[in-house]
Amino acid sequence: MNRLGGLSLPLRPVCLFCRAQTSLALSPLQGGQAVRSIATGRLRRRARMTLSKDVAKSSLKPKRTDRGKLGPFPNMNQTRARVREDPRSRSPAALKRSGETEEKPAMNTESPLYKALKMQTALAPISYGKRTAIKAKIAEITSFDAFTLLPIVRNSIFSQALPGIADAVPTPIQRVAIPRLLEDAPAKKQAKKVDDDEPQYEQYLLAAETGSGKTLAYLIPVIDAIKRQEIQEKEMEKKEEERKVREREENKKNQAFDLEPEIPPPSNAGRPRAIILVPTAELVAQVGAKLKAFAHTVKFRSGIISSNLTPRRIKSTLFNPAGIDILVSTPHLLASIAKTDPYVLSRVSHLVLDEADSLMDRSFLPISTEVISKAAPSLQKLIFCSATIPRSLDSQLRKLYPDIWRLTTPNLHAIPRRVQLGVVDIQKDPYRGNRNLACADVIWSIGKSGAGSDEAGSPWSEPKTKKILVFVNEREEADEVAQFLKSKGIDAHSFNRDSGTRKQEEILAEFTEPAAVPTAEEILLARKQQQRENINIPFVLPERTNRDTERRLDGVKVLVTTDIASRGIDTLALKTVILYHVPHTTIDFIHRLGRLGRMGKRGRAVVLVGKKDRKDVVKEVREVWFGLDS
């Protein structure tokens, strides 16, 4: 019964499919829509603005239709046997199921030397025949007088570059490079027809072992060329002045007046004649100091710019109204200046890339090539200089400069015999894997080994300070190792990128500059001061207690650093290097040990080898590299 009080009839079940058919019959469909199901009763239109997903595809696979499928009786009416010429190789899984074994390639029968020095293949080799030819050539030059240098430049070599060395002779790289760089036009370039795409300047590669005098090898020819250009410009200016005087006299006679004012000559401010590029600010300061020493007698203007200097000082140095002849800079800073002032590179005749293996790697290559291309119109000589020539640099130079002159020495990629290499296994007693303890023990042993030898000479003279350089692989470990050495009574300092600029200069100066010999006045002053302290007990020297010596190591200074100090830094006063870690590559090994044995001096290096370090590499380095002639 419903709400009105009447009886309600039971509901009749309705089929949805029947209702759909009824609705379809009431609205007749057209064409292909009549055969579609209820789910797709109305055809969906394709959107016009929908982008295709197959635009980027080079080719689309055609859909395979039923007609292309093989039937139940394929390949029955064949008149020719289709046999595969090359048998199909079986998969390893099929060989394993059949019980057969795949033929394995023969084991590598190379000697352990090849396996241990696998990273040495990154260095470009120098043939034995070429080494012999170079030795015969450099034996002919015995003094700097054999070079065609200006007298003022030759005299400055002995008084400024190499003071205190009476019998200074050219090093092998200087004997090879200086004569070639002094030439104006080598015969190799004259005989070849110059192409428009090829560089119009000469290219040179100076490659020699560390500490062999490569800086002077390119500085001396560059300074000589700058002075010769200056002499030629003075002669041209003199002739131009004479011509102007004659024109003025003729104008006075003819009573002619100049309608246009004379254009002043272009200023040389911010337009150096030569540029030397180095990778770090420390090398900028070092090369700049060498140039400044030459400038005292040769008389030319030089300047340095780096990130350690203020913008005001950089501007005053580069854009000095008096002009600048030689500029030392880093590539990134010079490239940024050249973008705002392109005329900076408009007068460059000599461009030097020191530490070329760094300046031509991935990080510096775009900037270095940009500077070279902007200086190309006026460039006369492009010089690359490096102690290591990786295969990447070698192939890059062959690609960019196929006609480059390669000036190398016989001992390239070698550590001379005058450097002794020792190995300390930190896994043995008493260290038991403690690398910090092993490093401190080695430093104490070195500091105590020669104690008393310097003190016996004079009671008034201070003992000679021993300087030790410790190399670590990570920047963070430099501070940690230095703090540990200080806790063991060792005067240690850390040197890395995080150190302040002034602190870096002070620390680095102690290890790069040799100690000055005290004068007679300084010795007399120290003697009087010590006599005043001991006036109550005359003629008796104070006895040294053992309290301080037990807790402190006197007469030793240690610098803990990374690879920032391994390239180009002239550590002539250094005699000991400790490798806290085994270097990652052969190139790092060479540059770290290259802080020793510079300019013919002796040195010793100690490598701390742990459980995870490559002991075989260190062993083969001792046997191979130290076997070459020094």
From Swiss-Prot:
EC number(s) given by UniProt: 3.6.4.13
Reactions that this protein is recorded to catalyse: ATP + H2O = ADP + phosphate + H(+)
CDD domains in alphabetical order: SF2_C_DEAD
Keyword tags: ATP-binding, Helicase, Hydrolase, Mitochondrion, Nucleotide-binding, RNA-binding, Transit peptide
Motif DEAD box boundaries: 354-357
GO biological process: maturation of LSU-rRNA from tricistronic rRNA transcript (SSU-rRNA, 5.8S rRNA, LSU-rRNA)
Subcellular location(s) per record: Mitochondrion
UniProt main location, coarse: mitochondrion
Top-rank taxon, per record: Eukaryota
Ranges for region Disordered: 46-108, 235-265
Signal peptide: none
Domain (Helicase ATP-binding): residue spans on this chain: 195-407
Family the UniProt entry places it in: Belongs to the DEAD box helicase family. MRH4 subfamily.
Function statement: ATP-binding RNA helicase involved in mitochondrial RNA metabolism. Required for maintenance of mitochondrial DNA.
Domain text: The Q motif is unique to and characteristic of the DEAD box family of RNA helicases and controls ATP binding and hydrolysis.
Annotated protein name in UniProt: ATP-dependent RNA helicase mrh4, mitochondrial
Taxonomic source organism: Emericella nidulans (strain FGSC A4 / ATCC 38163 / CBS 112.46 / NRRL 194 / M139) (Aspergillus nidulans)
Lineage: Eukaryota, Fungi, Dikarya, Ascomycota, Pezizomycotina
